[in-house]
């Protein structure tokens, strides 16, 4: 058991060193990777066995709050109800006649408007910074 903790501790320290080196390289903007060594950074603080166990047990905790999950309970009820109604209503309702042609143009017009707005340049060009480039 002690050997497992020491091996795990070494792995965690190696990951921390790798992460800190990657962050330092990103901040500096240094793209010369020839001189990079994973042991060259400042040593990570060594954690005790109890501290290591606490961090591991808190990460793999099986107890999770409903509010911390991706969907809340209320949204799950709404999604299940909407799904059930979309599956059941077409079986119950009689076939409906198609809507008038002008009514079909409304969603097409909304889509065209959204595409025009999406490709329109921003009117506030003073606040555009050069750090917002993604490439």
From Swiss-Prot:
Name of this chain's protein: ARGOS-like protein
Protein's cellular compartments: Membrane; Nucleus; Cytoplasm; Endoplasmic reticulum
Disruption phenotype: Smaller lateral organs including cotyledons and leaves.
Stimuli inducing this protein: By brassinosteroids.
Record text about domains: The OSR domain is sufficient to promote organ growth.
Membrane topology according to the record: Multi-pass membrane protein
Expression (tissue specificity): Expressed in cotyledons, roots, flowers, siliques and leaves.
Membrane-spanning parts: 76-96, 100-120
Chief location: membrane
Thylakoid in keyword set: no
Keyword Repressor annotated: no
Role summary: Promotes cell expansion-dependent organ growth, probably via a brassinosteroids signaling pathway. Acts downstream of BRI1.
Spans annotated as Organ Size Related (OSR) domain: 71-122
GO biological process annotation, one example: response to brassinosteroid
Keywords carried by this UniProt record: Cytoplasm, Developmental protein, Endoplasmic reticulum, Membrane, Nucleus, Transmembrane, Transmembrane helix
């Amino acid at each position: 058991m002690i050997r497992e903790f020491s091996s795990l501790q070494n792995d965690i320290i190696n990951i921390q060193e790798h992460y800190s080196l990657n962050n330092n390289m990103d901040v500096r903007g240094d793209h010369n990777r020839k001189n990079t060594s994973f042991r060259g950074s400042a040593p990570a603080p060594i954690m005790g066995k109890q501290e290591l166990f606490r961090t591991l047990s808190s990460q793999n905790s099986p107890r999770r709050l409903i509010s911390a999950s991706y969907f809340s309970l209320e949204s799950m009820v709404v999604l299940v109800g909407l799904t059930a109604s979309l599956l059941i209503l077409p079986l119950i309702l009689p076939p409906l006649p198609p809507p008038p042609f002008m009514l079909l143009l409304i969603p097409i017009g909304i889509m065209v408007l959204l595409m025009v707005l999406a490709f329109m340049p921003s009117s506030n060009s003073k606040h555009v910074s050069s750090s917002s480039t993604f490439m």
